[in-house]
C-alpha cells in the first residue's frame, strides 16, 4: 500500500484522538468525591492524575493542529516533524498512563509494606471515574501508536529509505567476506 493510500485511515485516527483525549481529560478533571469520615479527594491531589490531564490537553491540541496540517496540501518537508510529534505524543501518553495506572492500583489494593490502605471502598465513584478516564486515555494511546507507525511508513516511503541496505552495500559486504 502506498503512503498516499493511508491518508484516510491516518485522518480518521487523528480525528478519533481528539474526542478520546478530551473525554479522558474531562472525566479526570471533574473527578472529586467527598466522604464525611475520610474527607475529600480530587484529581489534583495526585500528581499522576494531574499529569494525565495535562498530557491529554497537549495531545488533543496537537491532534487538532495535525488535522489542520494534514488537510492542507501535504508537504513532504513536514513528514519528519509529524513523525517526531506523533512519537512524542505516544511516549507522553505511555508515561502518563503508567503514572495514573500505578495510582489507581494503589487506590484499589493499597500497599501493606508501606502502610497504605486501599481507598476505593471509601471513594468508589472517584476510582470509577479514574478508571474510565484511564481507559479513554489508553484508546487515545492506541491511536497514536498507529499514527506513529503510519507516519514512519510515510516518511520511509517518501524518502526512499528502507530497512535494508542498498544492493551495492550488500554486494560489497559479500565480496569482503569472500576475500577476507
From Swiss-Prot:
Where is there biased composition of kind Basic and acidic residues? Answer: 170-180
The answer to whether the entry has keyword Membrane is: yes
Query: Where, subcellularly, is it found?
Result: Cell membrane
Please give the residue ranges for the topological domain Extracellular. 29-48, 101-129
| The keyword Nucleotide-binding belongs to this UniProt entry's keyword annotation | no
Keywords assigned by UniProt?
Cell membrane, Membrane, Transmembrane, Transmembrane helix
Primary site of residence: membrane
Q: Which GO cellular component term is one of those annotated?
A: plasma membrane
So which domain of life are we looking at? Eukaryota
Cytoplasmic topology ranges: 1-7, 70-79, 151-180
The UniProt transmembrane annotation reads 8-28, 49-69, 80-100, 130-150
UniProt membrane topology term: Multi-pass membrane protein
Which family does the similarity line name? Answer: Belongs to the Casparian strip membrane proteins (CASP) family.
Note the subunit structure: Homodimer and heterodimers.
Q: Report what the protein is called.
A: CASP-like protein 2D1
Print the organism lineage: Eukaryota, Viridiplantae, Streptophyta, Embryophyta, Tracheophyta
Amino acid at each position: 500500500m502506498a503512503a498516499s493510500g493511508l491518508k484516510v485511515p491516518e485522518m480518521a485516527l487523528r480525528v478519533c484522538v481528539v474526542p478520546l483525549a478530551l473525554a479522558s481529560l474531562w472525566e479526570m478533571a471533574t473527578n472529586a468525591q467527598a466522604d464525611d469520615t475520610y474527607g475529600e479527594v480530587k484529581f489534583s491531589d495526585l500528581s499522576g492524575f494531574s499529569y494525565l490531564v495535562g498530557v491529554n490537553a497537549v495531545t488533543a491540541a496537537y491532534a487538532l493542529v495535525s488535522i489542520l496540517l494534514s488537510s492542507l496540501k501535504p508537504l513532504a518537508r513536514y513528514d519528519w516533524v509529524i513523525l517526531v510529534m506523533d512519537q512524542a505524543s505516544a511516549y507522553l501518553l505511555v508515561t502518563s498512563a503508567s503514572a495514573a495506572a500505578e495510582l489507581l492500583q494503589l487506590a484499589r489494593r493499597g500497599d501493606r509494606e508501606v502502610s497504605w490502605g486501599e481507598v476505593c471502598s471509601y471513594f468508589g465513584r472517584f476510582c470509577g471515574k479514574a478508571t474510565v478516564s484511564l481507559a479513554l486515555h489508553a484508546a487515545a494511546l492506541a491511536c497514536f501508536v498507529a499514527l506513529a507507525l503510519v507516519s514512519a511508513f510515510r516518511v520511509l516511503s517518501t524518502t526512499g529509505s528502507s530497512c535494508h541496505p542498498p544492493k551495492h552495500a550488500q554486494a560489497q559486504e559479500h565480496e569482503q567476506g569472500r576475500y577476507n
